[in-house]
């Protein structure tokens, strides 16, 4: 992203292509599902690059998505779970931070302690907050 911002044409093309690809996927899923309750951006870029979130959603206003631009551009993972769509948006858009490393560690500890049966019901520490 830094190289794209400083004018590297190949990096700019890569960012353009990725945003376009994600927009196509979101549109395809919306058509296939017939109704979308929410869109979630997560992981490194999804958590920390408001410009990318905005570019991915550009052109999807036909689905009734309205982004609070100031909140979107100001939101980073350190802010925790954040609703970045406006109250008028037909589809809620969230930025939700992840911590894959914590999940991996807790899975291993659960397996070693023989307390891990199913990841869908395992009591991760972050669920107890």
Locate predicted features.
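Adenine-nucleotide phosphate-binding core of ATP-dependent small-molecule kinases
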Residues: 1-32
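Structural signal for terminal/edge beta-strands and the immediately following C-terminal loop/tail
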Residues: 80-129
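Short, glycine-/Ser/Thr-/acidic-enriched flexible segments
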Residues: 7, 46-47, 100, 110
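Conserved phosphate-binding/catalytic loops in two-lobed NTP-binding clefts
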Residues: 54-100
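Flexible, glycine/charged-enriched surface loops at secondary-structure junctions
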Residues: 12, 29-37, 66-74
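Active-site proximal loops enriched in glycine and acidic residues that flank catalytic Cys/His/Asp
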Residues: 4, 15, 40-45, 71, ...
């Amino acid at each position: 992203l830094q190289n794209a911002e400083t004018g590297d044409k190949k990096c700019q093309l890569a960012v353009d292509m990725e945003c376009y690809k994600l927009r196509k996927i979101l549109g395809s899923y919306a058509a296939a599902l017939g109704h979308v309750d929410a869109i979630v951006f997560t992981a490194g870029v999804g958590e920390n690059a408001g410009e990318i979130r905005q570019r991915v959603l550009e052109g999807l206003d036909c689905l009734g998505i309205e982004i609070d631009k100031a909140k979107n551009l100001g939101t980073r993972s350190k802010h925790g779970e954040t609703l970045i769509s406006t109250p008028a948006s037909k589809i809620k858009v969230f930025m939700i931070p992840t911590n894959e490393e914590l999940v991996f560690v807790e899975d291993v500890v659960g397996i070693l302690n023989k307390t891990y049966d199913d990841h869908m019901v395992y009591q991760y520490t972050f669920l107890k907050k």
